[in-house]
Each structure stands twice: as C-alpha cells, then as structure tokens.
Amino acid sequence: MYDTSGNYSVCDERPFPDPYLMQRVGWLRAEVARAERRGRLLRPGDEDEARRMPDPMPTPEAFALLGMFLGLFPPAVIFFRLFDYGFTPRHGLPIFLLCLGMNVVCFAVGRAMGAFVGRKIDGLWQRPWPLLLAASAALGLLWGVVTGGLGGAVFFGFGAPVGAAAAAPVGTLAFALFAPLHRLLARDGMIEARHAWPLVFGVTGLIAALIASPHVF
C-alpha cells in the first residue's frame, strides 16, 4: 500500500520505540534487581523485627541526630578551650556572641548534613563492611568540611577554613564509629529510638571528651 503521492509504502513503516516506555522499563529492572539483592542480603527475620519495633527510627533521622549533636557539643568544647566561650571578662560579650553564633550554625547545618549522610548510607547497609566503613568516613569528612566551614564563616568569613579543618577529623571519626554500630543494631534500615539515642550521645560524648583532653589536643 502506498500513500497518495506514491512515494513510499505505508506497510513498510515500523513503530518507533517510546523513549519514556524504555526509561520506565529500565527503572523497573533496576528496582527488581535492587529488591532481589536486598532480599538475598537481609538477615533472617530483619523485616519482622523492624515491624515489631515500638519506636522505630529511620536511618536518615538517626544520622541527623548524630550530626546535630556533633554540631553542638564538640564545637562548644573547642570554644571553651580557646575562648572560655566568652564567659570571662577578658573576652567579653562580643566573643560570647561569636561563639554562640558559630555554635548555632554548626548545630543547624550539622543536622541537615547528618540527614544527607544518612540518606546516602541508607543505600549501603547491604554492602560489604569495608565499603561501608570507607563510605561513612568519606561522608563524615564531607560533613565536617561543610559544617565546620559554614560555622567558621560566622567568624568574619576567614574562620571558614579553620572551622573546616577542625571539624573534618571530628566528622570522619564520628561517622566511621557510628555507621557500623548503627548497622549492628538496625533491622531493615530501622533502629529503635531507645538504642539510637544512647549511641548518638555515646559517640558524641567520646569525641567531645577527646577534644577536652589536654593529652589529645
């Protein structure tokens, strides 16, 4: 059969594949493969234990708590050691306000960055332990650079590199400690709140104690 001009045969036409359909098929295949991999690697009974948790906490929320308190306590200890947090007459109100401003920024940014790290880590629970440790340390380093840099920027801008350099080892060590412990206690990506809170305060307290120790810094 030919068109009215007789130029080509309509019967020879073949339908072009729908690009959106191909995208959806590709996405579906990836999701199926991810679900199969997750099913193979989950510990027996993890899903049942997660459903039975009285107060489950998702991974991003647990890491957000860690980031929040890491942005609160370790910087406060540093400010006390350097400036007495502005509580002495020698430093006065301006130093106190600067320390408080930097602490507030670290607190807020630390929480946001902690949630970001948690979302990234959430996809790595079924990966090998060395990969989880390396990823958590690298993401902790990123947390420290961003949180410390923005917090230090309050100190007239030039405190940003100092803050980033000070917070980078804090984030690296804290998240490298927290991630494997969280993995041991979590079930299907969920951890009970009664386990998460002591874990957060334990890691944060350890970091703060190391900073406060004259034998370490």
Where are each of the predicted segments found?
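Juxtamembrane/disordered regions of integral membrane proteins
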Residues: 2-217
